[in-house]
């Protein structure tokens, strides 16, 4: 999902954001309302995800860990550019 498509959905609470980075990366800064589940823990914690909203997975640059996570979750998408693009880095 592009940043342009994502930001209005986030603003209106229409998506569930899943941050799959490691703990230290998440603590450095994260997208508001994001749930943190590191990619290495996702398979055993997938039951924690909602079924009533589209899920957008996020990592630092987008397309690596977030794409891998999105493949594990039916119907999920990943955020292009990740948190770097979201925060303008």
Regions found by a protein language model. Give the residues of each.
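Rhodanese-like catalytic fold shared by cysteine-dependent sulfurtransferases
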Residues: 1-16, 23-56, 60-89
């Amino acid at each position: 999902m592009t940043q342009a498509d994502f930001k209005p959905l986030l603003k209106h609470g229409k998506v569930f954001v899943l941050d799959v980075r490691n703990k230290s990366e998440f603590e450095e800064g994260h997208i508001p309302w994001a749930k943190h589940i590191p990619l290495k823990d996702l398979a055993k914690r997938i039951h924690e995800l909602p079924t009533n909203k589209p899920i957008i997975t996020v990592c630092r640059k987008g397309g690596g860990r977030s794409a891998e996570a999105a493949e594990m979750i039916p119907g999920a998408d990943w955020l292009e550019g990740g948190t770097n693009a979201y925060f303008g880095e």
